[in-house]
Each structure stands twice: as structure tokens, then as C-alpha cells.
A protein has these predicted regions:
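Canonical Rossmann dinucleotide-binding motif of NAD(H)/NADP(H)-dependent dehydrogenases/reductases
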Residues: 2-40
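Conserved glycine-rich Rossmann-like NAD(P)H-binding loop of the short-chain dehydrogenase/reductase
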Residues: 36-52
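The beta1-alpha1 cofactor-binding region of Rossmann-like NAD(H)/NADP(H)-dependent oxidoreductases
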Residues: 46-47, 68-80, 127
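Substrate-binding pocket helix/loop in short-chain dehydrogenase/reductase
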Residues: 106-131
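Active-site helix of classical SDR
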Residues: 145, 181
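Residue(s) in the substrate-gating loop at a strand-loop-helix junction
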Residues: 165
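SDR active-site lid
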Residues: 187, 193-254
Length: 286
């Protein structure tokens, strides 16, 4: 795949969260391949982080730093950004908030009685589960945005990319937590885009599309799922174009324009109701 936007990242410094595996790691690899100056990998998995940092550092000496960070803790995120900025020589051009967790479950105990939960070991979503979901999928990015703005504003600008999901506008049954967190993150991103436009800070929402990562667990990904590397290249192409909403695959491209179209509301109801009934019959859970 030929990328004609390599010059955009030339010499730029970046921080990527959730960077020890999957799409986050692929984003780091692609940034370095496209000429980024220094790249900070942040992740809570110290073992994987260390291994990939050392591997990339051999290929790009002096350009890579790994920082173990629990992104659900605001002070930890702030300190990680501070350490990263020091490593990057004071210039912070790009933050990609990629850390996230895929979550499925039944909304209530009553629902669980007649649901796929027994077959697929789905949990009833407790308040603690909801708090965890928002901590990882939403607040971690919020903390990153705050820390980045504090550095990027005085330096005259920068760019923040928040990784969301097509489920932010696709109401799939048994994924209420995941959908809610990603929808919230999308609107946070888009409102900040205009709030900080005049400060020179660009904000982009990005869906990775259906991608072959550990988020699938024991489930079989749909036919045609792309690799993390393919997803990363599409996301970064959208970053170079400052796209408001970067769509990671054809499914997201086709779904996003129609999700709130009143002229096809009846069709959407039929589609999503069918998905819910299929899942309730234990035929499919993603």
C-alpha cells in the first residue's frame, strides 16, 4: 500500500496509549516508518511494552521510549505525558488515545435469565463494570486530552486523535457499555475540536474498523477483517487530512452517514432488532 502522506509525520513527536499490542503498536510502528521524530509507547502491560520498546529501539535508536502507565489514573497520565515531553525535547505534536477495552454483557439480571449469558459466559453489567468501562474507554482519553492541551496550547498547537468505534452509532444488543463509552468519547472529541480550533490544536475521532486484535477473544472475527497495520495506515492517513471523523473500513464508511437518517429509520430498527434476536438465540455474540 503506497502512502503519499509520509512527509506529514516527518520529525513529529508522538505519544500513543495502549501501545503494547494491536492497533496501538501498529500505529507506533507506522509513525516511525513514516519518519516521526520520537515516539512514546504507553501501556499498562509492562512485559509486552518492554519487549516492543526494545525491538523498536534497535530499529530506531534514540527515537523510542516506553512508559508503563495506568491510564485510568489522572495523575499517572499527567506524569506519563510529562516524562514523554522531556524525552521528546519539549515538543509534543501528536497524542493518540488508543487504550480501550471491549465489553459485552447483559444489562439486567432479569434479562440474563433468558439471554445468551449462560452459553457465552456474559456477565450481568454491574455498576462496577460500568465504572470500569468508562474509566478505561472514556476517562483515560479525557485525562490525556487535558494533559496534552496543557502542553500544546503554549507551544502553538498540536493534534489529538481519540480512537472510538463504529459501535458509537451502531446500537448492538449486549454491548451497551462499550457503545455508551465510545459514543461519549466521540462527542467529547468533536466538541473539543471546535473549542480548541483557534489554539491550533486539531482533534480527530477515528474508528479502526473491524480489525484482527485480541479484543475478539474467543470469538471469530467477521470475514474480511483487516490487520492492525492496515487499520493504522488508514487512521494515520485521516490524521494527515485532519478529518473530523476518520472511518477505518467500508462498513464504517457506509454506516456512519445513515445512522441518524430519518428516511431509513424503519429499516434501521428492523436491522438492529434482528441482530438482537439473533444474539438472544445464542447464534452470535461479538
Amino acid at each position: 500500500m503506497v502512502n503519499n502522506n509520509k512527509g506529514y509525520f516527518l520529525g513529529k513527536n508522538a505519544v500513543v496509549t495502549g501501545a503494547a499490542s494491536g492497533i496501538g503498536l501498529a500505529l507506533c510502528e507506522e509513525l516511525l516508518a513514516q519518519g516521526a521524530g520520537k515516539v512514546v509507547l504507553a501501556d499498562i502491560n509492562g512485559k509486552n511494552l518492554r519487549a516492543h520498546k526494545e525491538r523498536l529501539a534497535r530499529q530506531y535508536p534514540g527515537q523510542v521510549k516506553g512508559i508503563r502507565c495506568d491510564v485510568t489514573q489522572e495523575n499517572a497520565v499527567k506524569q506519563m505525558i510529562e516524562q514523554g515531553v522531556l524525552f521528546m525535547g519539549g515538543r509534543f505534536d501528536l497524542l493518540i488515545n488508543n487504550a480501550g477495552l471491549g465489553l459485552s454483557g447483559t444489562f439486567t439480571q432479569t434479562e440474563a435469565t433468558n439471554s445468551p449469558s449462560a452459553k457465552f459466559n456474559l456477565r450481568v453489567q454491574t455498576n462496577e463494570d460500568w465504572e470500569k468501562a468508562f474509566a478505561i474507554n472514556f476517562y483515560s482519553a479525557l485525562y490525556g486530552c487535558r494533559a496534552a492541551i496543557g502542553v500544546m496550547t503554549p507551544q502553538g498547537g498540536g493534534q489529538v486523535v481519540n480512537i472510538i468505534s463504529g459501535i458509537a452509532w451502531s446500537p448492538m444488543a449486549y454491548q451497551s457499555m462499550y457503545a455508551a463509552t465510545k459514543a461519549a468519547l466521540n462527542m467529547l472529541t468533536l466538541t473539543l475540536r471546535y473549542e480548541y480550533w483557534d489554539e491550533g490544536i486539531k482533534f480527530n475521532s477515528a474508528t479502526p474498523g473491524t480489525t484482527l486484535t485480541a479484543i475478539w477473544g474467543k470469538n471469530t472475527p467477521p470475514k474480511g477483517a483487516q490487520t492492525p497495520q492496515e487499520s493504522a495506515r488508514k487512521i494515520l492517513k485521516g490524521v494527515t487530512e485532519n478529518q473530523r471523523l476518520i472511518l477505518g473500513d467500508k462498513g464504517d464508511e457506509e454506516g456512519a452517514p445513515h445512522c441518524f437518517d430519518p428516511s431509513i429509520a424503519e429499516g434501521l430498527d428492523s436491522y438492529y432488532l434482528n441482530v438482537a434476536r439473533v444474539r438472544r438465540s445464542c447464534e452470535l455474540i461479538l
